[in-house]
Amino acid sequence: MKNSIISYPRIGANRELKFAIEKYFKNQSSKEELLKSAKDLRIRHWQEIQKAGIDFIPSNDFSLYDNVLDAAVLFNIVHTKYKNLNLDALDEYFAQSRGYQGENGDVTALAMKKWFNTNYHYLVPECDNADIIALTGDKIFKEYLEAKELGIESKPVLIGIFTLFKLIAFKDEKTQKLAKEKLLNAYIELFDKLNELKVTWLELDEPYLVYDLSKEDIALFEEFYQELLNHKKDLKILLQSYFGDLRDIYPKLLESKFDALGLDFIEGKQSLALVQKYGFAKDKILFAGLINGKNIYTNDYAKSLKLIKELQKYTQNIILNTSCSLLHVPYSTEFESKLDSNYLKLFSFAKEKLQELKDLKEILNSSEENPLFRANQELFKNIPERLDEKVKARLKALKKEDFTRTPSFKERALIQKEFLKLPLLPTTTIGSFPQSADVRSNRLAFKQEKISAQNYTEFNQQKIKECIQIQEEIGLDVLVHGEFERNDMVEYFGENLKGFLFTQNGWVQSYGTRCVKPPVIWGDVSRTKPITLAWSKFAQSLSQKIVKGMLTGPVTILNWSFPREDISLKESTEQIALAIRDEVLDLENAGIKIIQIDEAALREKLPLRKSDWHSEYLDWAIPAFNLVHSGVKAKTQIHTHMCYSEFSDILKEIDAMDADVISFEASRSNLSLLDTLKAIRFKTEVGPGVYDIHSPRVPSVEELSLTIEKILNKLPKEQIWINPDCGLKTRAYEEVIASLKNLVTATQKIREQL
């Protein structure tokens, strides 16, 4: 029995990659220094994986920004607008990631989307010229040879041709048709080069196969691989899936020329049933994904061994594997000195998951009962308490009316118009303002008890004053307090709610250099005291203008945390919803007129198969949001915000959240969402982001005016809010002030024309 992993986290044990790239962005290091830091990290990771006793060690899973972009660049799928900048390869790569504004031109970044049902974001490759598609990159070969120099025969990992093709945004059908042929030839050439290098295994990741597949999808997949697998020669090909099961294509895969199939037995609800029904091919190896790559709890060896024994009825050719890439979990628990050992023993991050694979391999390869198995089972005895009877009783007492806000949206809109007295096209921001080094230092000093609560509060109050003043000078209509007290929109609430645990170094990559530290939902959740009330009251006291209360919604708190596995996601979410509801009512009672409840991650846990959307998710996720705000008065305006996702297919459900205003991150997706809003007669007022805050470029007044005009062409003017597409926390003040001034100027200019 051997073992394998799909991919390893690339950010480093202490986010070394993030800091190295950010230094390069700030011109504080050279290209050579950045590339050396990246290589050092790769070497460290390979040696770590090798030391842990992993047999199939991945290469080419490392990325400076995003692995989908890496695959696109490998095959020269680069839009002409980036080619025309005439930058070197690295800066062209980063121009696609972040946009570019300089002497060579001014271009926006590629659109960003959620990677399937995770909190990782990938960049959407754009193809306007299929003629240039060819194998022009060499990253996959270089990194294989780097590992080879260390004495490691690695397994290069690459996004498969079918998934890559489905993720590309093509200019038109003609481009798409030509791209199909060119991309196939490029993959064939890739196979040839890997054969020249005498590579043993290539892993092709095809997560798109876990979606509901149409007949056309299956035909396209077969068309690609029937040709491609004829060119594999000595190269062995592992078809790797994750985030679900292969129910639509599994029997066909058994008859294909793949040498191995990677199945997900964690999220693949039907993976085991498929093997039981159809068996497994004698000429193939089964890479069994049984170590959870998306959650942080210790593997129960009894369950894993039971699964393996069942699979061995159908095949003896089994490799122990992770369910997906380990980039979705933190690096290692060895940096967690503050967590009680009773909790920590039940956590397994990426490095610990390597040990689990090693243990399972050893247990399966030994003839008698192994002490490793006994030690694992001991961990699950004396688990710390998780239940709170008061929370259970409160959930039990909920009635149908607790999930419905009255009066209707239409009636509320009239009441709010009279009460709030806002101008046409009201301007606002999403919530956070830049967090400079002194803000972070102040928070850290308070956490480390180096300063008093009074000093901490006074510092933040001064920052809030400055933030309110800046917004008033710019001329925004609805203000925010800036969120200087918050490290992260989810972690902050988790820290102030009972039932959460926190790591010191549990960083996970969200996109590029952005990392998040998800809290752990350990027990029943409740609010023991107000969380944001004092900050909101203070901010509102500084201005005659409305200052929004800012909260994170229950679904986002759940989706951006590591969830419990002992109760349903529905129950966990409703517990959080009741806690946030208490905060909403406190804010309203304190005179806060607009309360924003962000559901940035609403789409994240949406099942990948449409048939499961309602029963497994939307039927409880939408009511949980309703539960948060159903108790407020008609005159209180409820806002929500949603991040990078595709929303067009769940807009009716979003409308059913019954918020008064919703802001979307729509700027990177070219405002295409507006057509759908118009088509379904979306009732909620909307603020489609008018510029992309994930890029350092400052949009001009003309550019913003054009965007606002586009929005006005699609939606009634009374329904529109003007705002950036996300919070401003990661930007510099000079960019923010310049961009917001242009936003207000453009809005005023348009108002005069209406």
From Swiss-Prot:
Residues reported in the UniProt entry to bind L-methionine: 430-432, 483, 598
Active site per UniProt: 694 (proton donor)
GO molecular function: 5-methyltetrahydropteroyltriglutamate-homocysteine S-methyltransferase activity; zinc ion binding
Pfam families hit by this protein: Meth_synt_1 (PF08267), Meth_synt_2 (PF01717)
UniProt-annotated binding residues for Zn(2+): 641, 643, 665, 726
Cofactors that this protein relies on: Zn(2+)
Superkingdom in the source lineage: Bacteria
CDD domains in the cross-refs: CIMS_C_terminal_like (cd03311), CIMS_N_terminal_like (cd03312)
Keyword Transferase: yes
Family note: Belongs to the vitamin-B12 independent methionine synthase family.
Function noted in UniProt: Catalyzes the transfer of a methyl group from 5-methyltetrahydrofolate to homocysteine resulting in methionine formation.
Name under which the protein is recorded: 5-methyltetrahydropteroyltriglutamate--homocysteine methyltransferase
Organism, as annotated: Campylobacter jejuni (strain RM1221)
